[in-house]
Amino acid sequence: MEMMKIDPLFDRASELKAFDETKTGVKGLVDSGVSQVPRIFHHPTVKLSTPKPLPSDLLHLKTIPTIDLGGRDFQDAIKRNNAIEEIKEAAAKWGFFQVINHGVSLELLEKMKKGVRDFHEQSQEVRKEFYSRDFSRRFLYLSNFDLFSSPAANWRDTFSCTMAPDTPKPQDLPEICRDIMMEYSKQVMNLGKFLFELLSEALGLEPNHLNDMDCSKGLLMLSHYYPPCPEPDLTLGTSQHSDNSFLTVLLPDQIEGLQVRREGHWFDVPHVSGALIINIGDLLQLITNDKFISLEHRVLANRATRARVSVACFFTTGVRPNPRMYGPIRELVSEENPPKYRETTIKDYATYFNAKGLDGTSALLHFKI
């Protein structure tokens, strides 16, 4: 096991506090002209390891599959069934897939990415007004939600907003990206309901099963900004983790960096023009009793000269009150395949996930029977 060198002059707690109190995030560091990554962002080399060469039996696993959703209007039952089978295989083996012809216009995707850039590239004084660690706020701008609990900080800033089930009031959102956030989240909600129909059928259930379980009821939007990193081999954009959602819809940038971990190996996710990246979250793995899997993933530090942006929309009600208990779906368990997880509320799962932070271990282990 690697031992981290201890510097007696390095006061991590003080440096974290000083960084947070600037209220300008990683973007503020870059704007100030830093040429070295501060120690609070240094990750152990074991966490930064580059992908090992694939053994011969895994060479066929190039990357996550890309699935055509037919504009969400399958006129041909065979094409719909083919898409369901592709989703079934991807959700069971990868937990990730890209979708094209998904029904969200390319123009809207570009406007959403521009909205993220516009917010993060405002003046520091304007951004500071939104910076907070009060997680009860509707709109939140900060750097690293787990800054004070994670082993190392990530080279990334984020703004987040709960978009459903309670739609935010216009005055809750920054004017610079207000309209596009509202419109984009509506489109993602519609796409999510459609995907949950296909996922239900892939499980052998009625099309409305997962939607009736309120899997598509809540939506949390996280808009990430990854500034160029002067020493990308020392840190990460996002640490290794799995998502505490039912499903995540990710709008990526042309600048690549996302990697998915499968069978002990890291796979790059390539840019596919106009595609959205879909991944199974922990809660969907839990209720499907491991029929679908929530794989760990990470984002490498940005080596480009331009900032990388992404928008992750998580289908979950998070820490908002929701008394419904979630456990393995009754139709998916039997004497031969008993429940593997205990029941939990979404709030309890999210609270445990947030307290644990992005430490490279799955929160699902805590809920195993």
Swiss-Prot record:
Keywords: Iron, Metal-binding, Oxidoreductase. One of its GO terms (cellular component) is extracellular region. Its cofactor is Fe cation. Residues 217-318 form the Fe2OG dioxygenase domain. Gene3D superfamilies: B-lactam Antibiotic, Isopenicillin N Synthase, Chain (2.60.120.330). InterPro entries: DIOX_N, IPNS-like_FE2OG_OXY, IPNS-like_sf, Oxoglu/Fe-dep_dioxygenase_dom. Fe cation binds at residues 241, 243, 297. Pfam families: 2OG-FeII_Oxy, DIOX_N. GO terms for biological process: biosynthetic process. GO terms for molecular function: dioxygenase activity; metal ion binding. PANTHER family: 1-AMINOCYCLOPROPANE-1-CARBOXYLATE OXIDASE HOMOLOG 3, OXIDOREDUCTASE, 2OG-FE II OXYGENASE FAMILY PROTEIN. Belongs to the iron/ascorbate-dependent oxidoreductase family. This is 1-aminocyclopropane-1-carboxylate oxidase homolog 3. The lineage of its organism: Eukaryota, Viridiplantae, Streptophyta, Embryophyta, Tracheophyta.
